[in-house]
Curated annotation (Swiss-Prot):
Glycans are attached at residues 435, 506. Residues 95-537 are lumenal. Components of the endosome-vacuole trafficking pathway that regulates nutrient transport. May be involved in processes which determine whether plasma membrane proteins are degraded or routed to the plasma membrane. This is Protein ssh4. InterPro entries: B30.2/SPRY, B30.2/SPRY_sf, ConA-like_dom_sf, SPRY_dom, SPRY_Ssh4-like, Ubq-SigPath_Reg. Residues 141-337 form the B30.2/SPRY domain. The gene is ssh4. It comes from Botryotinia fuckeliana (strain B05.10) (Noble rot fungus).
Amino acid sequence: MEDFLRGMQQSTLTTSVLFATPTSIPIIAAAQEALRDTLQQPTSLQRAAAAVATSTSSDNVQLKSSNDSTINGVVIGLLSSFGSAILIAFIFLIVYFFKYTSSGRILLDRIGRPGEYDDEQAFAKEEAEALEEMDDLQRTEYLRAKAFVQSNPPDSLPTDISLSQYLAIQEKGVSAWEFEPELEIANCFVEARTEIEFFDSECCTLTNLPVPKQNEVYYWESKIYDKPENTLISIGVATKPYPLFRLPGWHKYSVAYTSTGHRRYNQPFSGPVYGPQYVQGDVIGVGYRPRTGTIFFTRNGKKLEDVAHGLKSQNLFPAVGANGPCTVHVNFGQSGFVFIEANVKKWGLAPMTGSLAPPPPYGSEQGSILLEAGREGAQSSNGHYQPDPRHGRTRSGNFRHGPPTSPGPIRSPTDISLAQLTHFPSHEEPGEASNSSTPAPTGGVTQQSGLGVHDNAQPPPEYTSPLPSAAGSPRGSTDSERTPMLRRKTTPPPIPSYNDAVAQRNRSHSHRDRSGGRRERSDSHRARQGDGNPSQS
């Protein structure tokens, strides 16, 4: 029994150790303590689970910490970049404020362009300083130009292209543009529309038409043909009305590139350096972009920087001025440009040729006025010009007008004389016959023989239709313009025999002998009558 109880205790202890389940069987205190110690110690499975849980939690903590560090790095980088940009912009604004708003100036347009400050105080200060340095003549000219601009503001006159000017551009092309010199100043001379010659005083000239605004870019060039060293040339654009006794670029609204290398934009006092100086032989180009109102210049085919912006509402005219003797030739597009881009893209003011047809050739076509003015048949009875219908041609080439219906002087082909012809004005209406009764001329006018004037007793010979042309002649060809519409078939004449030829020869000799005898008898009869007349007297 004790052995059985002892075995049960061992099995219960083993079961409790393996399954960690408390037993209800009473055991001894030592066994209970041993069991308690065993239960308190973790098993290998529990150790593995605890290790896995610990590693997972540590990985989660590390991943979370790495994500937080990445986000923090990105945020710090963005904040540093924006902070640097804001700092640079702030520094730039400070420099800009102290540089461009000094002396009470107010900037109304872009940076770094002269003449764009509309501050009255600053302009008055510059004007006072400039007037002190001017001599009497320069001061007078400046005050005169100032008064002109005040009384004639820019664009105060209608300068838009009218319908008639538009039609002229369509007909003439680029030849519609030409420079108009001021006749009152008479200091420049324009030849062949675009060749300008200046003399000894200051003046400028503008074109008759403004620069169009339909295309993307318009461009024109000026070549310096003759320029002394002390002559100042100013090339650019200006609005109308403009004081023509001043150079372009000196007053509103005008932009110019001077021969000293400076640019003038509404600046009568001074201008900054813009580009290299140009001398005799150089080619200066002016470009205009209507959509943005941008003006740029070129020198010998090389583009320079833009000068002005925002000139979109004004009508700009090409302008050339000088203060001394020089010669400038302007190319609006009638020939090739030196600036390659403008030459390829056709930046001229208009096409080279318009739709206007050339004048008709003068000749015998459709009764040319130059040829018909000296002929007697050129005017009808009422004094109006009537073209000769015999000179007309049609596209068919075979149509021919009939003979003229109005009567004219009738001459025989054999009556040739160098004497002066006597002209009798015709009072017949067109369509009447040429042999109608005509009152005899009075006033002692005598008719001379051999002049082709016939009386009623001897009417002119009847006109017959011309013989048909031979098959091989130009009139006989069906493709020729001289081919008559009515053609008759002709048969070749028969070839006479030898007997017929001898008989015809004998008949001609006998006819000649009879006519000679008649002539001798008539001469003898006239001689007898002449001898008898003196005896009767």
